[in-house]
């Protein structure tokens, strides 16, 4: 692995690692966050496609790419909602764990990954490790019935949201185009969801997010997400880091997302909780490394 490949591979660490913290810091409602983020992603994708001269896909390639973006935006709305319940430092390790579980199980049952018996044993142990790691990140030294109930609700919401993240990853596999070509249609799907969501909430009496300034401030956070998505696509190419190594490098973003949430958003933990959280993060990343190297 050369220095250029490594730096590109760490792009998602910065982009996806800082994205939830920046979005939470800017504030606003989940609808403001998703609207600005998706507009920022679309602007970034359009500029990149124009600079690189990337053709716009058509037919089923176009529709599956848009579906992919719809899946991500739908899931991200759920994730933003959970941020308001338990904070990004708790939500991010859980949603990362669900995404790893979903991607691994989809690979096994739909794509034929882990074909041997030993592969399945190692993979199963890795999935257990991911679950334990996620649990460690939300462990609380001082038990509180109200907090425990809220956390259970958050976990259920994130489990439902995983359906959207799964669609984001799985839909492009039904196309015969590369990730860079799918980037703009994905962003279009994301914006469609955010606008529909904003109009739906407005019809129920909430202020229309399209006329709120904070929505457009969130374009900044959208640039961070788009930067991460693009550098991951480049990193995963065979002449860079390859899919397996690129994926592992991208998952390090959960560490930055969790720690910046604690340090900059006031999502406090005791010393013991902090050490347990770090242990959980290490376990999640180690288990992710196992799943892609089997």
From Swiss-Prot:
Signal peptide: none
Transmembrane portions of the chain: 5-24, 34-56, 61-80, 90-112, 121-138, 153-170, 182-204, 214-236, 243-265, 275-292
SUPFAM superfamilies per UniProt: Multidrug resistance efflux transporter EmrE (SSF103481)
Protein topology in the membrane: Multi-pass membrane protein
GO annotations of cellular component type: plasma membrane
Keywords: Cell membrane, Membrane, Sugar transport, Transmembrane, Transmembrane helix, Transport
Transport listed as a keyword: yes
Main subcellular location: membrane
InterPro entries: Sugar_transport (IPR010651)
One function term, GO molecular function aspect: carbohydrate transmembrane transporter activity
Compartments it resides in: Cell membrane
A Pfam family recorded for this sequence: Sugar_transport
Function: Could be involved in the uptake of ribose.
Family: Belongs to the GRP transporter (TC 2.A.7.5) family.
Protein known as: Putative ribose uptake protein RbsU
Organism listed in the record: Lactiplantibacillus plantarum (strain ATCC BAA-793 / NCIMB 8826 / WCFS1) (Lactobacillus plantarum)
Lineage: Bacteria, Bacillati, Bacillota, Bacilli, Lactobacillales
Gene behind this protein: rbsU
């Amino acid at each position: 692995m050369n220095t250029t490949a490594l730096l590109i591979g760490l792009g998602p660490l910065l982009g996806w690692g800082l994205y939830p913290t920046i979005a939470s810091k800017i504030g606003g409602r989940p609808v403001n966050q998703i609207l600005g983020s998706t507009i920022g992603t679309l602007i970034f994708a359009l500029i990149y496609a124009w600079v690189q001269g990337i053709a716009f896909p058509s037919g089923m390639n176009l529709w599956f790419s848009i579906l992919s973006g719809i899946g991500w935006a739908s899931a991200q709305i759920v994730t933003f909602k959970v941020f308001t319940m338990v904070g990004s430092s708790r939500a991010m390790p859980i949603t990362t764990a669900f995404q790893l579980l979903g991607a691994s199980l989809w690979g096994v049952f739909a794509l034929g990954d882990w074909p041997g018996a030993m592969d399945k044993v190692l993979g199963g142990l890795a999935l257990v490790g991911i679950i334990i790691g996620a649990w460690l990140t939300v462990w609380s030294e001082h038990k509180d019935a109200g907090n425990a109930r809220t956390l259970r609700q958050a976990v259920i919401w994130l489990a439902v949201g995983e359906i959207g993240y799964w669609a984001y990853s799985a839909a492009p596999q039904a196309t015969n185009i590369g990730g860079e070509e799918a980037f703009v249609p994905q962003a279009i799907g994301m914006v469609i969801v955010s606008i529909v969501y904003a109009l739906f909430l407005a019809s129920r009496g909430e202020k229309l997010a399209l006329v709120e300034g904070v929505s457009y401030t969130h374009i900044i956070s959208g640039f961070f997400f788009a930067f991460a998505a693009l550098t991951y696509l480049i990193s995963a190419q065979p002449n860079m880091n390859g899919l397996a190594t690129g994926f592992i490098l991208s998952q390090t973003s959960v560490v930055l997302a969790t720690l910046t949430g604690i340090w900059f958003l006031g999502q406090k933990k005791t010393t013991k909780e902090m050490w347990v959280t770090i242990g959980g993060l290490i376990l999640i990343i180690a288990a992710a490394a196992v799943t892609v190297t089997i």
